[in-house]
């Protein structure tokens, strides 16, 4: 057995985690096909790079099933609207990393969003001011009345 295979054999590790009811086992193994030669017998069938076993030892992931799981994850991500296009992600990119042309484009987008925000605020304030309030009852103020004048008490 070569030193590389010995190191690889020592690299097989198990980690046990206890979560609520189930016990999970994680095995990290390197694929034997990359390192083994025909003269070295392979006593253990390590078809997977990373395997995940629950307490009932049902295999969830292997290198053969990896693409199937990735397709499943892509479906879930698409279903939950988690995946975004590059154009959506550029909004979270620091502006200093953009080219001047891209900065101009995104400044225009910022102006558009500011105008939309101002328009919605104006519409909200107009609907608030145009709602019929209680009619103002004008109270009699004798000091502003034309018929009342303290100087002309004669």
From Swiss-Prot:
Q: Which UniProt key words apply to this protein?
A: Phosphoprotein
Task: Write down which residues bear the modification named Phosphoserine.
Answer: 47
Question: Can you tell which superkingdom this protein's organism belongs to?
Answer: Eukaryota
Q: What further fact does the record state?
A: Present with 721 molecules/cell in log phase SD medium.
UniProt record similarity statement:
To yeast YPL229w.
Can you name this protein? Answer: Uncharacterized protein YMR181C
User: Which organism does this record belong to?
Assistant: Saccharomyces cerevisiae (strain ATCC 204508 / S288c) (Baker's yeast)
């Amino acid at each position: 057995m070569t030193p590389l295979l010995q190191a690889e054999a020592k690299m097989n590790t198990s980690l046990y985690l206890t979560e609520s009811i189930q016990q999970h086992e994680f095995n990290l193994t390197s694929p034997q096909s990359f390192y083994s030669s025909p003269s070295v017998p392979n006593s253990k069938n390590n078809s997977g790079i990373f395997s995940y076993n629950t307490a009932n030892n049902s295999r969830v992931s292997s290198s053969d099933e990896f693409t199937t799981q990735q397709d499943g994850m892509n479906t879930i991500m698409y279903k939950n609207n988690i995946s975004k296009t590059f154009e959506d992600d550029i909004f979270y990119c620091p502006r200093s990393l953009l080219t001047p042309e891209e900065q101009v484009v995104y400044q225009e987008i910022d102006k558009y969003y500011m105008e939309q925000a101002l328009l919605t605020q104006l519409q909200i304030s107009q609907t608030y001011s145009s709602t019929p309030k209680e009619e103002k009852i004008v109270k009699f103020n004798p000091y502003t009345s034309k018929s009342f004048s303290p100087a002309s008490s004669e």
